[in-house]
């Protein structure tokens, strides 16, 4: 259950960051504020959920799991904004996945 909460907190955080990226690309002032407001809501929810996670998961396991953000952001950037993923970046993401598996198995 704790790992599900970590993934959900990470997804909320990524959602907030993606809203910030969208706000940076939006030209209409009203839309910018909408994206920024949504970003604050998602990041606030992520923080509250993260505080709960820290009550139930050892810090030495929980914090490295935040590297899920790098994976989610990379995938979202690729599929939403069609940003290329260089070989070096892809290898880095694969290494992060290996690290998460190793840490998850050690917990």
From Swiss-Prot:
Which UniProt keywords are listed?
A: Cell inner membrane, Cell membrane, Lipid A biosynthesis, Lipid biosynthesis, Lipid metabolism, Lipopolysaccharide biosynthesis, Membrane, Transmembrane, Transmembrane helix, Transport
Q: Name one GO molecular function term.
A: carbohydrate derivative transmembrane transporter activity
Which residue numbers delimit the EamA domain? 31-105
Q: How does it sit in the membrane?
A: Multi-pass membrane protein
Mind listing the GO biological process terms from this record?
A: lipid A biosynthetic process; lipopolysaccharide biosynthetic process
List where in the cell it is found. Cell inner membrane
Decide whether keyword DNA repair is in the record.
Answer: no
A Pfam family hit: EamA
SUPFAM superfamilies assigned to the protein according to its UniProt record, in alphabetical order: Multidrug resistance efflux transporter EmrE (SSF103481)
Note the InterPro entries from the entry: EamA_dom (IPR000620), Flippase_ArnE (IPR022883), Small_drug/metabolite_transptr (IPR000390)
Its pathway? Bacterial outer membrane biogenesis; lipopolysaccharide biosynthesis
Give TM segment ranges: 34-54, 57-77, 85-105
One GO cellular component term: plasma membrane
Spell out the disulfide connections: none
- Name the family the entry cites: Belongs to the ArnE family.
Per the entry, what this protein does is:
Translocates 4-amino-4-deoxy-L-arabinose-phosphoundecaprenol (alpha-L-Ara4N-phosphoundecaprenol) from the cytoplasmic to the periplasmic side of the inner membrane.
Assembly mode: Heterodimer of ArnE and ArnF.
What is the name of the protein in this document? Probable 4-amino-4-deoxy-L-arabinose-phosphoundecaprenol flippase subunit ArnE
Annotated source species: Enterobacter sp. (strain 638)
Q: Which gene encodes it?
A: arnE
């Amino acid at each position: 259950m704790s790992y599900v909460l970590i993934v959900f907190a990470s997804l909320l955080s990524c959602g907030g960051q993606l809203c910030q990226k969208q706000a940076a690309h939006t030209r209409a002032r009203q839309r910018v504020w909408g994206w920024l407001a949504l970003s604050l809501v998602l990041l606030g929810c992520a923080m509250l959920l993260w505080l709960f996670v820290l009550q139930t998961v050892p810090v030495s396991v929980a914090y490295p799991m935040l590297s899920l953000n790098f994976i989610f952001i990379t995938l979202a950037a690729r599929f939403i904004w069609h940003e290329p993923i260089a070989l070096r970046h892809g290898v880095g993401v694969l290494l992060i996945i290996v690290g998460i598996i190793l840490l998850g198995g050690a917990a």
